[in-house]
Regions:
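Conserved phosphoryl-transfer catalytic core
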Residues: 343, 352-353, 358-360
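Core catalytic lobe of class I
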Residues: 1-25, 31-336, 342-344
């Protein structure tokens, strides 16, 4: 405390977060490793701050963020949720610069942690899609809660929130741009129905400017493009072009939104016990190494739902690299960083085991 500080001064009421040494972390190897990176055909893992590595990574189809929660969970985590926007800001800025129109962000956090970061994500062009709840069940808090003294309901959940890019063309949303291009052709709106071979679906769905707007499937988009370029005003050609020289193809159009395939039988509540058993990475003494290690099945769930084989997955805050490992199992490319040397070392061992198992097949 400063000798000149007043009893109610901000320097007393709000101190900078202290080190997390001794809080939650069970392994301190204190070893100078002879490596700081690991890679194979699918995965690139780095020891260090992801802010120093983003520029070397391929553009992401998916970003899986499992960083600061505001609970002093690791060295550098904030002491509460209030400082989380400042902690995430440089990362979100970097993600936004690297993202492509089809990028999906899966943002893991506590409810309040996500809530305070959400406005920042919107500011940088990320559109909220859905909030998914990981329900760990009562077993997660069994024997650890005194219901006679607790002043709230016990917490057994985390959130994994889905965001996509708010794609714009010349500062117009996609639905506004589609309508503008058709009007620019000079053709009446009803002719779009002729182009698509429908009664009224084109004008009713593809050109709607409200909540009923429907992203035109590849085939229908190509029909609109071909019709406008064949029958539209010659002075405005090509229509539906990003560069003014060539119209978008159907394949290019399909990449203007994120990928998602909903697996059968799943909802936005994932009832799955906290991680135990062989998958939980432990020290030689048998203690769980990383308190926030995510289950592989949940990581595989979001990766598989929002990517295809050989797509790129970013895991900026690797921990034990669960997202990268899930991506590798699904034949996706993964780029990940972990700033803590001990977590990095143990995380890499998971991949050494995986490679060894593959060699036995």
């Amino acid at each position: 405390m400063s000798p000149n500080a007043e009893p109610n001064s901000p320097s007393i009421l709000k101190r900078k977060a202290s080190s997390t040494v001794g809080r939650g972390k069970v392994a301190n190897l204190n070893t100078n490793f002879n490596f700081s990176a690991w890679s194979d055909e699918y995965v690139t893992l780095n020891l260090g701050d992801s802010l120093q590595h983003y520029d070397n990574w391929e553009q992401p189809t998916v970003i899986i963020s499992d960083g600061a929660y505001g609970i002093l969970g690791f060295e550098g985590d904030t002491s509460d949720h209030i400082d989380l926007p400042n902690w995430y800001q440089p990362h979100i800025e970097a993600w936004s610069k690297a993202a492509i129109p089809s990028t999906t962000l899966w943002f893991w956090n506590s409810e309040i942690g996500w809530a305070v970061v959400h406005p920042l994500l919107e500011k940088y062009g990320w559109r909220y899609v859905n909030s998914n709840i990981w329900n760990k069940g009562k077993g997660h808090i069994a024997g650890n809660v005194n219901t006679q003294k607790i002043r709230r309901f016990p917490v057994v959940t985390e959130v994994c929130v889905q965001y996509v890019r708010e794609v714009t063309v010349n500062e117009l949303t996609l639905k506004a741009w589609l309508l503008q291009e058709w009007k620019r052709s000079g053709l009446p709106l009803r002719r779009a129905n002729d182009a698509c071979g429908v009664v009224d679906a084109a004008t009713r769905k593809y050109f709607d400017q409200g909540h009923l707007w429907y992203f035109p499937p590849t085939e229908m988009f190509e029909r609109l493009v071909n019709y406008a370029n064949e029958y539209g005003s010659p002075q405005g050609k090509p229509y539906f072009s990003l560069d003014g020289n060539q119209s978008l193809t159907g394949q290019e159009w399909s990449k203007m939104r994120s990928k998602f395939r909903c697996p059968h039988g799943f909802t936005n509540v994932w009832a799955r016990p906290a991680l135990r058993g062989n998958e939980r990475v432990k020290t030689i003494s048998g203690k769980a190494l990383h308190l926030n290690q995510k289950p592989l099945d949940l990581m595989k769930l979001v990766v598989e739902a929002s990517t295809d084989e050989n797509d790129v997955v970013w895991e900026p805050f690797g921990g034990l690299f669960s997202a990268a490992l899930a991506a590798r199992k699904l034949k996706r490319k993964a780029f990940s960083c972990e700033i803590d040397p001990d977590y990095f070392y143990y995380g890499v061992q998971r991949f050494n085991q995986e490679v060894h198992q593959d060699s036995l097949l």
